């Protein structure tokens, strides 16, 4: 629902590797869109190969968003590792890329409501400690919900016109501060040139 509200007009493009994990995530996305915005256009590439990225990127337009629902495939059909998939997809497409797992963060993806192996491990550890402390396992409720959290990289979101204030409260945000050099490079260079010119003139006048 967050992505649909941030990008109300664009198409949703789902990329995957054809695995069982991908199929499950694709089904979740389909169900969510059918419930929240049934008229939203979906483009699905269930077994995308890396050499197809240029054609995909050329067809995208402002307002579209990509969901990397698992990994993608190498040219020879092998699974691309997650880091490589995240980096290459986010570099190739001119729109934000949302994901399901926190190990994609840092590759250029925009983020999302992410599952974390660390958080899941911590939850499992808490259950183990309760059992070791003597609590009967049959009295411990089964944990069915993954301890997910909102995690975002503002660099790609800022390029798409999303402000940090548009994100859910409590979100983990990286690259929250804009780069002064990137955003004001022209102004900084102009000021530097003026200062150098003034100093040079002063030196000449004092000589």
Describe each PLM feature range.
Residues 175-207:
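Alpha-helical transmembrane signal-anchor helices
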Residues 143, 147-180:
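Juxtamembrane amphipathic/hinge helix adjacent to a transmembrane helix
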Residues 1-33, 142-152:
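An alpha-beta-alpha
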Residues 23-31, 37-140:
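Membrane-proximal low-complexity regions enriched in glycine and acidic/polar residues
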Residues 50-57, 154-161, 186-190:
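Short alpha-helical interface patches
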């Amino acid at each position: 629902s967050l992505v649909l509200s941030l990008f109300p007009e664009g198409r949703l493009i789902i990329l995957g590797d054809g695995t069982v994990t991908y199929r499950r995530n694709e089904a979740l996305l389909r169900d969510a869109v059918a419930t929240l915005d049934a008229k939203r256009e979906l483009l699905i590439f269930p077994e995308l190969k890396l050499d197809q990225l240029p054609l995909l990127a050329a067809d995208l337009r402002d307002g579209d968003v990509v969901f990397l629902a698992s990994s993608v495939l190498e040219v020879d059909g092998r699974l691309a590792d997650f880091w490589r998939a995240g980096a290459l997809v986010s570099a190739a497409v001119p729109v934000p890329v949302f994901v399901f797992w926190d190990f994609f963060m840092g590759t250029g993806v925009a983020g999302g409501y992410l599952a974390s192996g660390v958080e899941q491990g911590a939850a499992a550890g808490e259950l183990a400690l309760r059992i070791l402390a003597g609590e009967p396992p049959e009295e411990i409720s089964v944990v069915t919900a993954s301890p997910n959290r909102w995690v975002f990289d503002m660099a790609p979101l800022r390029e798409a016109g999303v402000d940090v204030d548009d994100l859910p409260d409590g979100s983990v945000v990286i690259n929250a501060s804009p780069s002064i050099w990137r955003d004001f490079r022209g102004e900084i260079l102009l000021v530097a040139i003026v200062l150098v010119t003034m100093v040079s003139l002063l030196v000449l006048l004092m000589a």
